[in-house]
Structure formats: C-alpha cells, structure tokens
Design a protein with these regions (language model features):
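A composition/biophysics-driven feature that prefers long, compositionally simple stretches
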Residues: 1-138
C-alpha cells in the first residue's frame, strides 16, 4: 500500500488549528474533479488546495467533512477500491486504506455521501463550503 507523502499528524495539527476558529461549525471540502484532456486521457491530477492542506489526501472523487469537537470529527468519503479501474487510473486507497493510512475517524464510500452527510451536518450551527468552485458537488 502506498504511504501518504507526509505524516498524518501534520494534517491533524492543521485541523486542530482550524477547529479553534470555528467551534460548533463544520467544513465540507470536496476534491477537485479530474480534467479530461481527450477521450481517453486526463491532465495530471491536482487536489483542491484546502482539502490537501487539511487532509493530505490526493485522490479525486473524495470529500472531507470536518466537525470540530463532535464525534466523529473527521469523516472522509473516498472512491472504493476497484482493481480494474486502478489498472487504468492508478492506485486508490479505498475505504479501509484511507482509514488506516490517514487516521480519519470514519471513512465511507463517496457513493454514500448523500445518505450520510445530512446526519453528520444536522447538529452543526454553521457549515462552511466553497460555493461555485466545483459543479459536480454543488
């Protein structure tokens, strides 16, 4: 399994700094979509900056829900493992790998986002989200 490029504790410290600034709120950070170059090729992937800074997770199709002071505090949604797609698109951590390597409190498949996210956000006083940055996740 591929290791994260930095120690996950660095990202935990960054999230702790943010937590002190937004008590009772949540942050939702979706990954940037992949940019298609032509019908069967993509441009090199670049993660959304805030997600990369706070989670260190560099795969497309992901979303971080960060809820400071709540249980679970860090919930990551990722693309599931798929050996066939990995042959063409490259390595994927999947649900188990993301939890093991990055230390998120909970990890779900991105396919479960619409079902799980409302329950995660219902008790939050505010939700921070960048509007109009990613049409796929609006």
């Amino acid at each position: 399994m591929r290791k994260p490029y930095l120690n996950p504790r660095i990202f935990q410290q960054r999230r702790q700094k943010l937590a002190s600034l937004i008590p009772g709120a949540a942050v939702v950070l979706p990954a940037w979509p992949e940019a298609i170059r032509n019908h069967d090729g993509h441009f090199p992937y670049r993660q959304e900056s805030s997600l990369l800074y706070l989670a260190g997770f560099d795969e497309p199709g992901a979303c971080l829900v960060f809820r400071p002071g709540m249980k679970p505090e860090t919930v990551m949604f990722v693309r599931p493992k798929n050996v066939e797609r990995e042959t063409w698109d490259g390595f994927r951590y999947g649900v188990d790998g993301a939890k093991q390597e990055f230390g998120f409190d909970e990890v779900y498949s991105i396919d479960e986002f619409e079902k799980v996210a409302p329950t995660l956000l219902k008790d939050c006083q505010k939700v921070y989200y960048s509007l109009y940055r990613n049409r796929e996740t609006q």
